[in-house]
Each structure stands twice: as C-alpha cells, then as structure tokens.
Amino acid sequence: MSKSALLVLEDGTVFRGVSIGADGISVGEVVFNTSMTGYQEILTDPSYSQQIVTLTYPHIGNTGTTSEDEESSSIHAQGLVIRDLPLIASNFRSEQSLSDYLKSQNIVGIADIDTRKLTRILREKGAQNGCIVAGNNLDEALALAKAKEFPGLKGMDLAKEVTTKEAYQWKQGSWTLEGGLPEAKDDSELPYHVVAYDFGAKRNILRMLVDRGCRLTVVPAETSAEDVLALNPDGVFLSNGPGDPAPCTYAIEATKVFLEKGLPVFGICLGHQILALASGAKTVKMKFGHHGANHPVKDLDRNVVMITSQNHGFAADEATLPDNLRATHVSLFDGSLQGIHRTDKPAFSFQGHPEASPGPHDAAPLFDHFIELIKQHSA
C-alpha cells in the first residue's frame, strides 16, 4: 500500500500526493526541468544539490535506472516531484526501479500531483523554497515552517560541499550501448594534460574531454593555483556545479592566476560564471533559471541556432561585461548571456551543457575549440 506525501511551498501552496521514495522530510529550492528523458542523469547531477526537482513530462520512471547512466556516485537532488510513476519499468538495461532507486539512497519523492500547476507557480512567482514530507505523519504546518526557514541558494557556496576530497586521474572515454563502459585509455592516447576543477563535475564532461585526447587530473574545488601550476597542465577546465558562484572566491582567485599566465581555460555552467567573475563581470540570480534539454541558443560568431541542455539558476550579467570579454552566445528564450570569450587570453566558457546527458549534442564542438586553444598555446 502506497504512503502519502505532501509538498508545501513557502507561499503556503500545498500539494498532496503519494510517496515514491523514502520516508522523511526534505527541504530545498523547488525548480522545474522540462526534459522528457534523462531523469537519472538529472538526479545524479551535483548541480542540483539543495534543489527539489520537478519534472514536467508526465510519465517518469518508464525505463528504470542503471548505474551506467549516473553522472556521479549518488543522487544530489534533495527530492523529486513527478506527475505519474508508471507501474512497469521496461528497459533491458534496467537494474532497479526509480522508486527503489530513490529509497536505496534515502531520497524523498512525491507523485500524483498537478505538476502543470506547480510549474506555472514557479514560472510566475519564481523558484521557491519548498518542503516534501513523506510517510505516515504529514504535518503541513511543520513543512511550511521548514520551507520558510530554508535560506535559499543566493550566497550559498555549495561547490566545496560536493567536490572530490582528493585529486584523481580520469582516463575513461564515452561509453557505447554495444560496448558499455570502456577501459581507461593509455597515456600514449592522451597527449594533452588538463587539470579539471571539480565544482560538481558530471562524468560525461570528463568523458568527452578524454575522447578528445585529454589526460585529466581532477582536483578539489579549493585547490590553489600554485598547486595546479605545479602539475604543469596544458589547460585548465572549470566544471559545472551547484549554488551561487559569487562566494567561490577561492576559484575566482585561482582562475585569475591562470588567465594571467595565459593558460587555455574552458568553463561550463558554474565554471562559466567563475570565468566571468574572474574577468571582472558580475552574476545575478535568475527568476526561475533554465532547466531542460530543449533550450535554443544563438551562436553569435557563426550566426546559427543550437538546441542545448541547460541547468542553472544564476547567470553572468551581460551588461557588466568588461572590455576583455565578448559575448558569444545568447538564449533565445530570454536573451540571457550563454557564452563568453576573452579577447586577450585563450579562455572561453558556455553557460549550458555541451556534454548534454541528457540532451542534444549541438554544442559539443565547444570541446573541440578548447583543444584548438591548447594546441595553439603549446605550439
């Protein structure tokens, strides 16, 4: 017999449904994601730390879960909100149902609520703090109090919370449906040594860098520029991650050093915002952010439109770009800045997710541009 659950927003709105995960209470910023597929990749994306994810597509869980689809070693989302959980997970790769997967990692989830209504609230009022309560004792007043107590993501430094504790090597390329996860590549196949800052890095980003010949040393978020330079890298990668970029002063200061040294730098998502801040621009908290796999972005240099995967609640403010930065990409949904390139250094970044997972691969050539900058710098 299914247990009950409720979701309470900080404005007092209450949604009652059924529990699809663990019993308990979970608090975070409630956001919506419009992706039709890729729910496991979304749940395990460290960028969703301290966020409760609402999936707008009505049927979630159809294909079960598999370890090959994880973007990190655990679920980072605070909770999951969906319309309907199918009774059957049909997929020859499936290892566990979505419900069992949530329970195994002690993640709270709720289904059978009006996710269209919830999404309209978040679009009109902006991302809100919320609380999911699941189990036998549902206390609306307690849930509302906890939602109001949550401080919100603005000013919250989460990169240092989700980062790796120790540096490690990554040499595994992309997996295939036929071959599964590949063995680590030999150093002879990886001519470029790249230091990747882990602010909450997704595995598929690392794989796509390896596919292009990068031997990766993944380092903790607070690693000093001095320690990175001692590794003699050919380039530096700034990963995606959760929270507000402004408090990440350790990363901003380190990036300034790499820019001064003229090292090739590539940033994605939070890494994009870090590069912007290190170059003198400012960032802002968005009303409800971009979360989905169908976001159109215009490449200003090539005058083409790309469909991209997005997941961010903060953005670099184009109005604050200094002369050493030029805008390279803009969102066709709201005109927000999506890409920048230094005019004086081999450094650039992209707000969306060129590695997709889930999502389209239109922006994947950005990885190739990073390799081009490394080659030019090494010549």
From Swiss-Prot:
Stored CDD domains: GATase1_CPSase
A GO BP annotation: L-arginine biosynthetic process
Binding site for L-glutamine: 47, 241, 243, 270, 273, 311, 313-314
UniProt GO molecular function: ATP binding; carbamoyl-phosphate synthase (glutamine-hydrolyzing) activity; glutaminase activity
Residues in Glutamine amidotransferase type-1 domain copies: 193-379
PROSITE patterns: GATASE_TYPE_1 (PS51273)
Catalysed reaction, written as an equation: hydrogencarbonate + L-glutamine + 2 ATP + H2O = carbamoyl phosphate + L-glutamate + 2 ADP + phosphate + 2 H(+)
CPSase, as annotated region: 1-189
Active site: 269, 353, 355
EC number: 6.3.5.5
Keyword terms, alphabetized: Amino-acid biosynthesis, Arginine biosynthesis, ATP-binding, Glutamine amidotransferase, Ligase, Nucleotide-binding, Pyrimidine biosynthesis
Pathway(s) the chain acts in: Amino-acid biosynthesis; L-arginine biosynthesis; carbamoyl phosphate from bicarbonate: step 1/1; Pyrimidine metabolism; UMP biosynthesis via de novo pathway; (S)-dihydroorotate from bicarbonate: step 1/3
Pfam families (alphabetical): CPSase_sm_chain, GATase
UniProt keyword Iron-sulfur present: no
Subunit structure: Composed of two chains; the small (or glutamine) chain promotes the hydrolysis of glutamine to ammonia, which is used by the large (or ammonia) chain to synthesize carbamoyl phosphate. Tetramer of heterodimers (alpha,beta)4.
Function per UniProt: Small subunit of the glutamine-dependent carbamoyl phosphate synthetase (CPSase). CPSase catalyzes the formation of carbamoyl phosphate from the ammonia moiety of glutamine, carbonate, and phosphate donated by ATP, constituting the first step of 2 biosynthetic pathways, one leading to arginine and/or urea and the other to pyrimidine nucleotides. The small subunit (glutamine amidotransferase) binds and cleaves glutamine to supply the large subunit with the substrate ammonia.
Family the UniProt entry places it in: Belongs to the CarA family.
Protein name per Swiss-Prot or TrEMBL: Carbamoyl phosphate synthase small chain
Organism: Vibrio vulnificus (strain YJ016)
Gene: carA
